[in-house]
Regions:
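Extended, charge-rich alpha-helical interface modules
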Residues: 5, 26-148
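Bacterial N-terminal signal peptides that target proteins for export
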Residues: 2-15
Length: 148
């Protein structure tokens, strides 16, 4: 082979590698860990409903609750999975985790209102309503168990 053909092959392999990387980045579900795959799926299609259900099951099964302090995205707020998991886990959360969860729920409205495209007004509204309700529940649980 000539120097030209090696260079040409290297360029082709490089371009293919870049293409694969970009395609992985373009799809939220490929780039995300399994437990977070449903967090970015916000429409009402059967696929997204299933993905959100699977994500919720994985969050609920995580005994370490490592997800509690991971920062959410606007689509994670809109999907409702994390907020719903906080609602379901509120009796198991430590006082620190309850405080963090409530701050996250309280942060949903500004995050959703500031979301740049991709969310419908109905998705934003539903996410905000759920977060407000769960914030109240988390606050009540915190007040019941975590008084200073």
């Amino acid at each position: 082979m000539t120097g030209y053909s090696i260079s040409w092959h290297a360029r082709i392999v490089g371009l293919l590698g870049c293409g694969l990387l970009l395609s992985a980045c373009a799809s939220n579900e490929v780039a995300m860990p399994a437990q977070q795959a449903g967090l970015g799926c916000v429409d009402d299609s059967a696929h997204c409903v299933s993905e959100r259900g699977n994500a919720l099951k994985m969050l609920m099964a995580d005994k370490s609750r490592s997800w509690v302090k991971q920062p959410p995205t606007a689509t994670a707020y809109a999907s409702g999975v994390r907020i719903w998991a906080f609602k379901q886990k509120k009796h198991e959360l430590t006082c620190d985790e309850l405080s963090h969860a409530r701050r996250e729920a309280d942060g949903a409205a500004p995050a959703l209102r500031g979301a740049k495209g991709g969310l419908t007004p109905a998705q934003i509204s539903r996410g905000i309503m759920l977060a407000q309700d769960v914030s109240k529940e988390l606050g009540n649980e915190f007040g019941r168990r975590c008084r200073a």
